[in-house]
Amino acid sequence: MPHSRAVRAGQLALLLFFAISGALTGCSALTPTASERSSEAAASGAAAFTLQVRAPKEVRDYLEKHLELQRFRAFPDLQERELSRLLGAADANARELLATLGYFSPDIQIDLTKTPDDRRAPRAIVVTVDPGERTTIKALDLRFQGDIETGPTTSRPEARARAAWSLNPGEPFTQEAWDDAKKNSLRALQKRRYPTASLANSRADIDADTHQAALSATFDSGPAYRFGPLHLKGMKRYDAEGIKNIARLPTGAVYDETELLDAQQRLASSGYFDAVFLTLDPDAQQPGAAPVTAQVREAPLQKAIFGIGVSTDSGMRLSLDHTYNQLPWLGWRALTKLSFDREAKVLGTEWTALPGANGWRWVAGAQLQREATGDYQVNSTQWRFGRSQSTDHIDRNYALQYDSAVSQGPMAPPESTALSLNTGWTGRYFDSKTAPASGWGLAAEFGVGTTLRPERDPFVRALARGLYFQPLAKVTAPDGSSRRARIALRTEVGAVLARPGAQIPVTQLFLTGGDTTVRGYSLRSIGARTESDQLFGGRYLAVASAEWQRPLVFGGTVSDFESALFVD
C-alpha cells in the first residue's frame, strides 16, 4: 500500500507539472508582442507621446516631417529608459536637420510633460527652435582640370558648366542646393564632349559665427569624346547599313547626349524595333572615336491592327492596317490600309525601302478609293513612284504620279486621267513635337503634268499650307502644372493652271469644309459649280483661320483639353 500511494503521488506531481506548463504556455500565447502592441495602438489611434514643434514655418514643417522622434510615436509601450535615450539624441538630430537648411547655430529646447488625462497620449514633447541667422554664400571657387584645360574650344564647356552652377554668392546655403549645384555643373559637362567627367573634390567651409559659407569644387573633365562607329546588337533581319542610315548618328562628331538620344528615338520610332537602347563605350581606348552600341529587339515581321472610330465629318469608321516589315526578295516595308466610313472607302498600300547614306529612300504606292466628292461619287485610282527624305525638321519628296477619276451622278464630268511629276517640301519648327505653344510649320507641293484622257492638256498644280503658334499667358493649376495659352494661325492656298476646258482629275482639284478646314460646313461641301450647277472640285483654293486656345484645368491639374474661339 505505501508503494501504491507513492505511485499515485508521483502521477499527481506529473499531472500538476503539465498543468502548470500548459497554463504558462497559454499565458505566453495570450501576451501580445511589441510589434502586435504597436499595431493595436496604431489601429486604436493611441500613441506613445504627442510631438509639437514650435519654430518658424520655413523650418517647422521640415522638422515635423523628418525628426527621428516621429518614428516612435506609434509605440504606446515605449519604456521610460528608451524615451530618455530618444530625447537625448533629439537635440543632435534637430541640429543636423537644421544644418541641411543652412542654420548652423540654432537654439533648441526640448520639454517632456506627463499628460495622463490626454486621450491621445500619456506624454507630450515640445521642441522649441530658434534657428538663428541663415548661412549665406560668401565665396565660390570653381575649378576645372583634365582635357578641358588644354583641349580646343575649352572656354565653351567650362562656360556651360559655370552657367549650370546654381548656388552663387549671396544666396542661402542648404545641403540640397549644394548637392544640386554640383550635380547640375557635372551634368553640363557630361552632356557634351566629356561624358566621363567627374567631381574631383568639393568643400563647403561653414563659419557658424559669421553665418557665411565658402564653397569650392573641382571638376575633372576626363578626355574629350567623339562618336565612333555604330554597332548593332540583337538585329538579325535587316540590312545593317540601312538601319544605320535611319539612326543618322554623326560619326566623327563631338559627343553630344542629345544627338545620341535623337538617334535612339529615330530607331525606336522607325517601326522596325520594339526596343532600342544606345550607349557610348566610356572605356574606349580611343575616346576620339568611341564606339556606340545599339542594343535592339526586332518588332514582329508582320502586324495587323483593327480600328473602329467615329468623327463628326465622316461618321463611323472601320479600318484595318497591315504592316509587313520585310517583303520577300525586295526587302522593302509594305504598309497596307483598308478603311470604310460614311464618305469614303479606301484601299491603299505604300512600299518603302531602307534609306541610303544620304537619307533618301525609294517609295512606291497605289490607292483605290470611292469617295463622295461634291454632288458626285468618284471612283479614283492613284499610282505613285519616287523618293523621299526625312530629317528632324524637314521632309522632302519627288515622284511620278498617275491619277484616274470616274465621277458618277447626274450630268457627271467625263472620266479623266493624268500623269504628273510632283515634288513636296515640309518644314517644322515648333518648340514641342507633341504640344507646341510657339513656332511655325510650312508645307508646299508643286507638280507639272498632262491629262491623258479625254484629251491631252498640260497643267500646273501648286498647294501651300502654313501654321503658326503665338504663345500667350501661362495657365497654372493648383498642383503646379502649367501650359501656355496660344493663338493658332492657319492658312492654305492652292491653284491648278490649265486651259478652261481641260478635264483635270477631280482628285487634283480642291474642295474644302469640315472640322479640320472651315468649321460650320460639312466635309468637302465648299467647291466650284459645274455648268449644270453641281458641286465639284475647283481650281483655286484659299482658306484662313485664327484660333485662340486655352488649356482647361480639371481636378486641380492642367488637362489635355482646351477651350477655343475661332474664325475660319
Spans of model-derived segments:
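Bacterial N-terminal signal peptides
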Residues: Q11-T25
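Amphipathic hydrophobic-ligand
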Residues: Y103-D107, P195-S198, V378-S380, A418-S420, ...
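Periplasmic polypeptide-binding modules associated with outer-membrane biogenesis and secretion
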Residues: C27-D61, R71-T312, D321, L335-A353, ...
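C-terminal outer-membrane beta-barrel translocator/porin domains of Gram-negative envelope proteins
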Residues: S269, K303, M411-P414, A418-V567
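Gram-negative/organellar outer-membrane beta-barrel architecture
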Residues: D147-T154, E158-R160, D256-A443, T516-E531, ...
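Short beta-strands and strand-coil junctions in structured, solvent-facing domains, enriched
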Residues: T135, K191, T196, A224-R226, ...
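Bacterial N-terminal signal peptides that target proteins for export
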Residues: P2-L14
